Regions:
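Glycine-rich phosphate-binding loops of nucleotide-dependent enzymes
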Residues: 2-527
Length: 527
């Protein structure tokens, strides 16, 4: 399927001296890309050798994704030269790039929601390959690399973590010489990340060059042989990440000392949001929730951990009003709201930041100002949009959350993933909700922006808001949560104070092994 990869003798751990004198797999010289009001890439030059893992580090909006799009043929540079295996590279489309052996795993998934996994994978492969062959390869690669997914699943029914697996599988099936990974671990569990890294080391040892974008400094230090740092579209450093501390890498990335998340303890008040024995059906491919109960008090953050695809999406749908149930199953300020939709719950003081940015949290074709209308009830009066107020509010979000964009009239889809996430989070937080539901608050966000978002959530909590955060970042949950619960196969564990549980215990709970869970009971009954 696609061009085969020539095996080389390079070890998984790349050592720079081994490649001296070798023709670079990819060479960029003075790559420049301008958009109206911004220079995304400013005379960027870099090389990557066969078998090398090169990390690209930079803040949101530093130009990383634009550079990858240029290499992959999804964008054309205004200036500069690119060579691949010593020959000039002039690809104009991703299809041409794939033919040459360049594959990319996108940060914003390039999948068709209404097609199956097999059909999505087939779109990136040569014609003449049967669906049965593709399904077999998906299963084999999934088992080999820990990327299991049902080939018959329709993408719209998959969790974000499962969609990530589809993207990675699709890239691997083209047998690339150069694999570009844009935030590939943002929705993967620690166990899945370890499996992915094992896969990448194996591919590297086979001569595959890997360009790896990540905001997770520990991952860059673990995986990458070399790290190129971009700031404001320019290369500012090229370092051995293993020889640098995370603090030094963060300092190189943002140009000063990284911000810290402030500490503070909750002063919880009365219960303001409650779910009572809520069940929401799943399907053969989507995990529902079963008999879920949770009470959240004013002035506390409850974090919910769990491996992607264990019912988090259904839980948030039931909590936000996207899935309706009996009225008294969900209480908001002691009033039954189970039969009320998201708009009615929002008017009552509950706001929701969904997992999927584009198409769910924001309309990509609309401007940032127009995207404030979607949840800004104060921006509409008697059916008329208050445009000046909306524009002022959008600019306030941009300023407070350091969103990198020329102005508020830019389309949401033109922003980098991290900047769009900052805008969405800021839009909801600055509306001062009394109850806030957040799914993956810092997905794909750099360390500086993540600190801004986490501090904003803590300030909102201190102002008396009740907050539920669903995240696969266990460290993040321990950093901001007052209580932590775990979802597993649609069941929710008790929410316990974070001071009474360790990260290791949370990891065990993520397999359903909390005290008195239905899964431990089934295990004991079996014995």
């Amino acid at each position: 399927m696609g061009a085969s990869v020539q095996l080389s003798s390079h070890s998984a751990a790349f050592e720079a001296p081994d490649h001296i004198g070798m023709t670079p797999r990819l060479s960029l010289r003075n790559i420049t890309k301008r958009y109206p009001g911004i220079t995304a890439n400013d005379h960027v030059s870099l090389d990557i050798a066969p078998g090398e893992v090169l990390a690209i580090l930079g803040e949101n909006g530093a130009g990383k994704s634009t550079l990858m799009k240029i290499i992959y043929g999804a964008a054309r540079p205004d200036e500069g030269e690119i060579s691949f295996d010593g020959h000039p590279l002039g690809v104009e489309t991703p299809a041409q790039a794939r033919e040459l052996g360049i594959a990319m795993v996108h940060q914003h998934f390039a999948l068709f929601d209404t097609l199956s996994v097999t059909e999505n994978v087939a779109l990136g492969l040569s014609t003449g390959i049967s669906a049965a062959e593709i399904e077999r390869e998906i299963r084999l690669l999934g088992e080999k690399y820990g990327l299991e997914v049902d080939p018959a699943s329709v993408v719209m029914e998959l969790s974000m973590g499962e969609r990530q697996r589809v993207e990675i599988l699709r890239a691997l099936m083209t047998k690339p010489k150069l694999l570009i990974l844009d935030e590939p671990t943002s929705v993967l569990t620690p166990q899945a990340v370890r499996k992915l890294f094992k896969t990448l080391h194996q591919l590297s040892s086979e001569g595959v060059s890997i360009l790896f974008i990540s905001h997770k400094l520990d991952e860059i230090r673990e995986l990458a042989d070399r790290c190129v740092v971009l700031r404001a579209g320019k290369v500012v450093a090229s370092v051995d990440p293993k020889a640098e501390s995370e603090e030094n890498l963060a300092r190189l990335m943002i140009g000063n000392d990284p911000p810290t998340v402030r500490e503070g303890s909750a002063k919880a008040g009365e219960v303001v949001f409650e779910m009572r024995h809520v069940s929401a059906p799943g399907s053969t491919r989507v995990c529902g929730i079963d008999n879920v109960s949770l009470a959240v008090r004013a002035g506390e953050i409850v974090g919910i951990a769990g491996i992607s695809g264990n019912g988090q999406a259904r839980f948030m749908a039931a909590a936000s009003g996207e899935y309706l149930c009996e009225a008294d199953r969900v209480l908001l300020f002691n009033s039954p709201v189970g039969e009320l939709d998201t708009h009615a719950r929002r008017i009552s003081g509950l706001r929701y930041v969904p997992e999927q940015r584009l198409g769910h949290a924001a309309v990509p074709e609309l401007s940032l100002t127009a995207n404030t209308y979607l949840t800004g009830d104060s921006l509409v009066r008697s059916g008329f949009i208050l445009r000046d107020r909306a524009r002022s509010f959008a600019n306030l979000v941009i300023e407070r959350f350091h969103v990198k964009t020329p102005n508020a009239e830019k389309a949401a889809g033109s922003l980098s993933g991290g900047n769009l996430q900052k805008f969405i989070m800021g839009r909801e937080i600055l509306n001062r909700p009394r109850v806030l539901l957040v799914h993956q608050p810092t997905w794909g966000v750099d360390v500086g922006a993540a600190a801004v978002i986490r501090n904003s959530l803590i300030r909102l909590r201190d102002d008396g808001a009740a907050i539920i955060v669903v995240s696969e970042e266990i460290d993040e949950l321990f950093e901001i949560s007052d209580r932590i619960a775990v979802m597993y196969r649609g069941a929710l564990s008790p929410a316990v104070p974070k001071t009474t549980i360790s990260i290791e215990e949370v990891g065990r709970w993520m397999s359903g092994l909390w005290p008195d869970s239905p899964f431990t009971q089934k295990t004991s009954e079996a014995h």
